[in-house]
Amino acid sequence: MKIISTSSRGNFIYERDEKKILELVHPKWFSKKAITKYNNKNIKIEPKNYWGSKYLIVKEGIEKGSIDVDWKNNITITFIDQNEVAQIFKLTNKGFWKQQFEFSNIEGEIVIVLTPLNTWKKWTNDLAIESSLNYSNQKYFDELVIYCGFVVRLIQQYAGAGVV
């Protein structure tokens, strides 16, 4: 499983077993909005405020979750899955030279680990996805990857701007 960057503004393709599952697209160059289609439903991630500290997750015009960034860069992803159950995940950024982005659930169990695939010779924004089988088989897993990919690209953009 991996996330392949298609542009520098944050667009990416999510592949699972060498098959394209979905593509996340930013409609305008400096737009903080992101749009994708998953399970024949339109999913939009859009900023709630000017500062970019809260993003809304909107499915088919109905608010279904949020991505919250506090002043210490603690990031929480909250969304309602297909079974109408609230899912909450927290980001932990590990490493300095070799970064890893770990997303854990409320119980503290690591669900997804995203690792950048770049080296000092070749700079890319692609990410490898690692997860245990009991989580990768969950119905909400692919949807969670959308939000995790968006968050990691957001962090990389903050770091590039010197905000972090």
Residue ranges: model-predicted function:
Residues 1-33, 38-40, 71-74, 79-164:
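Low-complexity or membrane-interfacial segments used for flexible interactions
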